A protein has these predicted regions:
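Intrinsically disordered, low-complexity terminal regions
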Residues: 1-211
Length: 211
């Protein structure tokens, strides 16, 4: 999902099969099973504990929060953060524009984690594909593992005000990136901080490394 940002802007508004709520939040109680996509504009999505959502969660101008031991498919948010509790399973991607992404220990994200203008802060989490950012910092803690790469994409793909020149990537507490860390613009100032005990098994390209 190398150019996820442009695709998400389109898909968020053309959402076949979604029941779209406007100016209203969606709350799924503990232990519920949901067999549909959840999509709201100017509202948030809250999924309780031990839930199973066989659909995507999409929000414009609102946040997404998934509580402990729940399972969902793709998570997409414009102008809002994504918060994941303990032992959450995401059977797809987690994507934000203008919002942070955070997770608690035991969480597994099967796809990519992607953010514009927001920090990615993962604790004890497995990402089975890539982490992609344009201007947000990335922090991996508590033995988090990224099976793919970390990529800092080029600026200016869309009008997203993401032209921040400095990005910090910090790996702590024995966290590991199995692939590469790739900065796609040589004039972007990116620091990879491994002083907290993290490892990158692949290459680090176009970034300063602190050991």
């Amino acid at each position: 999902m190398r150019h996820v940002y442009l695709g998400f802007v389109f898909l968020a508004f053309v959402c076949a099969g979604c029941n779209i709520e406007v100016n209203k939040s969606i709350e799924i109680g503990n232990d519920e099973h949901v067999q549909k996509n959840l999509f709201t504009v100017n509202g948030s999505i809250q999924v309780g504990k031990r839930c199973q959502v066989n659909g995507d969660c999409r929000v414009v101008n609102g946040s997404i929060a998934i509580d402990d031991d729940s399972q969902v498919r793709d998570l997409n948010s414009i102008n809002g953060r994504i918060s994941l509790g303990k032992k959450v399973t995401i059977r797809g991607d987690a994507v934000t524009i203008n919002g942070a992404i955070s997770s608690e220990p035991g969480t597994v994200i099967s796809g990519d984690v992607s953010s514009i203008n927001g920090e990615v802060d993962l604790r004890g989490t497995e990402v089975r594909k890539d982490i992609i950012t344009k201007s947000g910092d990335i922090i991996l803690r508590n033995r988090s593992i990224v099976r793919g790469d970390i990529r800092v994409d080029k600026r200016g793909l869309i009008n997203d005000n993401s032209n921040r020149l400095y990005v910090n990537i910090r790996l702590a507490d024995d966290s590991v990136v199995e692939g590469d860390i790739i900065v796609e613009e040589k004039d972007r100032e990116v620091t990879v901080d491994l002083r907290g005990g993290g490892k990158v098994l692949g290459e680090i390209r176009n970034a300063e490394v602190l050991r």
